[in-house]
Amino acid sequence: MSKHYAAPEEILYHVGFSAQQLQGATVAVLPGDPGRVEPLAKALGSDASFIASHREYTSWLTKISDTPVLVCSTGMGGPSVAICLEELARMGIKKLIRFGTTGTIQEKVNLGDIIVDKAAVRLDGTSQHYAPLEFPAVASFEVTTALVLAAKNAGALYHLGIAASSDTFWPGQERYDSFTGYVPRRFRGTMQEWQALGVLNYEMETSALFVTSQALGLEAGAVCGVVVKRTQSESVAPPDVYQRAFGYMVQVTRGAVELLLQRMPINW
């Protein structure tokens, strides 16, 4: 398939910035929440600077190992992730790390722990627009290896496993604490099934990230902080739990980006 890159000065319609503004960056870190972009960019590297804010996409540039790295929010869910990836690919981004929050469904995983997802159950609709359901949602080996090595080096409490990516926060994740409490028949009992199969966590973006990246020829990985432990409660943990996870996630992500920027094979 031919690839269509943007002109250096072209402002891309959705993200609202140009390749020229990326200063040659080829690695992007992707939080979901636009409000987390600025603190993340400043925590990850040096000389952090604002690029643009348009729709759900807030973007900053930071420097890790003296190399420009993009930090860009994706909003919630697969559609906005795929749009972001399409436009970042046109501007020369090659490697991506999702930086998010998640709810675990396994007793062995605790609040504040880190999950590195190596694959995802495709409960979303977006990925089906890029590949049939038989096609696996798997992370880049290189990016995932970098994340695991960085987690080991940081001494983080991490788990490597599989996510279940749902288009919805309530029914698709079999949550009954919604406005009506209604969960369609097709989703009832599914959390127990995913638990039995060893799935670690529910979230809303990773399957779209992995499948879209593969379709576009990009390399992607995902690291998430655990803020809900659904074997105990449906409630999101207090902010201090996220802050603890955020600190480790920053160390892990920075370490992984440093490895990826070395442009050499990564060995276990």
PLM segments and residue spans:
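His/Asp/Glu-rich mid-to-C-terminal helical/loop segments that flank catalytic regions of hydrolases
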Residues: 230-268
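Generic non-transmembrane alpha-helical segments
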Residues: 146-154, 212, 252-263
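Active-site rim beta-loop-alpha module in soluble metabolic enzymes
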Residues: 138-198
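A C-terminal functional module that forms or caps the active site or interfaces directly
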Residues: 188-227, 232
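Metabolite-binding pocket within alpha/beta catalytic cores that recognizes anionic/polar moieties
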Residues: 1-146, 150
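Conserved active-site and cofactor/substrate-binding residues in soluble primary-metabolism enzymes
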Residues: 31-35, 76-79, 83, 91, ...
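Short acidic/glycine-rich loop or secondary-structure boundary segments that cap or lie
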Residues: 105-107, 124-125, 167-174, 231
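Flexible, glycine/charged-enriched surface loops at secondary-structure junctions
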Residues: 47-53, 155-162, 261-268
